[in-house]
UniProtKB/Swiss-Prot annotation:
NCBIfam families: PRK00685.1. This is UPF0173 metal-dependent hydrolase Dred_1740. Pfam families: Lactamase_B_3. It comes from the Bacteria.
Length: 228
């Protein structure tokens, strides 16, 4: 299975059966590689902010992929004429060989729309993805929360994708505490260095995590991938 970093919080997860993109912020993303074909079966969207909903509608129309998100955001996407699967936090669903479970995230969830400058779209979320005997946790945009301990206790996480940019999400110090609770085998930092406001040193984060835990940190540049 191949996990490719597309910049910011966007990832492409592929095996022989499934192609899945998470938070596909590609157009307008200064970090996004534009030479990687993104033709997903499924599109997971953690919340409606432009740097996460991103190109989801366009990709869904081009590929007939299904957008998976919280109920309100899925309904918003359905109004744009695409296939959706609505869920809510704590719920899980099998999509062929893949299971997806929605988790809590501490953030906002709105987008500009024809109903006004912003439309509230329910709660934001993270995702647990179970595919090919592996478990991947994409935290979405979130601050640190205590139930990360439960997520770690109830799952054997192979790879955790965690924001470290601070300001809009948890920063490196809180992300280290998240690693301690989640206990993943590997962590990939995300949601940093896209703009000056979320500038961070991922090497310092890697050093702190690997000194304090047994978790390995993989710093991926946009376009790089990890074989899981």
């Amino acid at each position: 299975m191949k996990l490719t970093f597309l910049g910011h919080s966007a990832f492409l997860l592929e095996n022989q059966e499934v192609s899945l993109v998470i938070d596909p912020f590609l157009t307008g993303n200064p970090m996004a590689p534009h030479d990687i074909p993104v033709k997903p079966n499924y599109i997971l969207v953690s919340h409606g902010h432009g740097d996460h909903l991103g190109d989801a509608i366009r990709l869904a129309k081009e590929t007939s992929a299904t957008i998976v998100s919280v109920f309100e955001l899925a309904n918003y996407c359905a109004r744009q004429g695409v296939l959706t699967h609505p869920m809510h936090i704590g719920g899980s669903h099998n999509f062929g060989p893949m299971k997806v479970k929605l988790t809590q995230a501490l953030h906002g969830n709105s987008t500009g729309s024809d109903r006004g400058p912003a439309e509230y779209l329910g709660n934001p979320c993270g995702f647990l993805i179970y595919l090919g005997n592996k478990t991947i946790y994409h935290a979405g945009d979130t601050g640190l929360f205590g139930d990360m301990q439960l997520i770690g206790d109830l799952n054997s996480i192979d790879v955790a994708l965690l924001p470290i940019g601070d300001n809009f999400t948890m920063g490196p110090t809180d992300a280290l505490e998240a690693v301690k609770m989640l206990k993943p085998q590997r962590v990939i930092p995300m949601h940093y260095n896209t703009w000056p406001l979320i500038s961070q040193d991922p090497t310092a984060f890697k050093k702190a995590v690997e000194q304090a835990t047994t978790t390995q940190v993989d710093i991926l540049q946009p376009g790089e991938f990890l074989k899981i």
